[in-house]
Amino acid sequence: LHLCDRRQRQMCIRDSHNKTDAAKCDVKKAYPSTTVECVMNLLRRDIGKNKPLLWLVEAVMANYPDGVLLIGGYLPCWLFNYVMSYVLRYILSHRKVRRGKSSKMILAICCYADDITVYGRISNLTKVMKDTTRWAKETLGLTIKSAWDIIHFASFDAERQQNKRRKAGSHQRTPGLDMMGYVVRRTYTIIRGRNFVKLRRAILRAQRDLDALGYVPWWRAQRIMSQWGEIKHSDSRGFCQKYNIYKIIRAAKRSVSWHSKQLLLKEQAHGAVC
């Protein structure tokens, strides 16, 4: 399965100096659409000689209601990834021949669960996704939604010009890929809009608590620390300087550490009494 983190998504966009587009789509009702019969057919094809393993997997899935994968299970998660790997390999297998030379139609793929992002030229992407939608439905029983998000990434020069306009007061941005909590563009990455609004609100309230109480309540500190990774892995230096993020993060870490120690002491005291 071609999983793709933030850095890999950036590389797909930035390493290609030519015109690059992206098509983002997802599978409709991914787990309920993946049948036990489909999974077993693929497993028999790939590991047909391993009879004990086939028997075990089939016995476990025999309890699944309606004969489809369960949502939230550990085994269904990996089995769905296994089925999706066939879709991704089929997408990457598309090639075209021009002047006797064969070339790839797809530049790269990023996949997160049932969300698929395909990179390449828009003319190639349209052909590949239409063919893949038909193949996935006929072969695997999966329905890829027809409502694709098409992103036309701006060039490096267009990004620089837009950056100058933003410094002059404009609030517009160039098109970006919104996936996994980030919006990725050729020259920078930011946090998704609604996630940023929630984070900024929590930061402001934490600063107010820090000024009034001298500490950040543990429950608010946990909420902030859960989004600390989004700040670290995005271009948020101006945000950190404006709102004194590093000071608040240090206070949040102390609060979370203190709360964890209190819980540990309670567990030890309860164990001693018992």
Features from the language model and the residues they span:
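Compositionally biased amphipathic helical and low-complexity segments enriched in hydrophobic
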Residues: H2-C4, V57, S93, L264
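Aromatic side chains
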Residues: H2-D5, Y31, Y112, Y182
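Generic detector of low-complexity/intrinsically disordered segments
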Residues: L3-D5, I144, M179, L265
